Amino acid sequence: MLNIDQQGLVVDKRVIKAISPAIERGPMNVVSGLIVHQTGGATAQSSLDSYKRVAANGAHFLIDKDGTIYQTASVKKQAWHIGKLKSRCMLEARCSVARKKLNAKFNPSLENKREMKKSAPDRFPSNKDAIGIELVGEALPRGAAIPNLPKLRARIHQHCF
């Protein structure tokens, strides 16, 4: 069980409090999702430092490569870690004809405004209702080639079976 105090902070000795007021925005009254990101940076400290900048963006939690968990914002406050929302019905191929026409022209700002009029789960979670978790690092180093999956599977199979 996760214990959360009145201020929205996790009460657990394994979670290091590193609250950055610059990333806390308005109140978050309901949580409809968890969004996991990768920082793209090499260290937790680089993210923690960036969270101190004026009008910084960041997530509620930061998990370092060694597993250290930092809480960087209250779970009772919004943290801006999500960009403009894309149309969920378009991505899931279930939009009405009228909605498809609205989304036919590429306009991220208008698409975001339309999506924000919806409630979750009819739209993706947003900054106003999602807890953000950032993992230090990136999926592949910048410039690295995307692995050939069939070849990778064959190598794994060869070594494991």
Predicted regions located by residue number:
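Active-site-adjacent loop/helix surface patches within enzyme catalytic domains
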Residues: 2-161
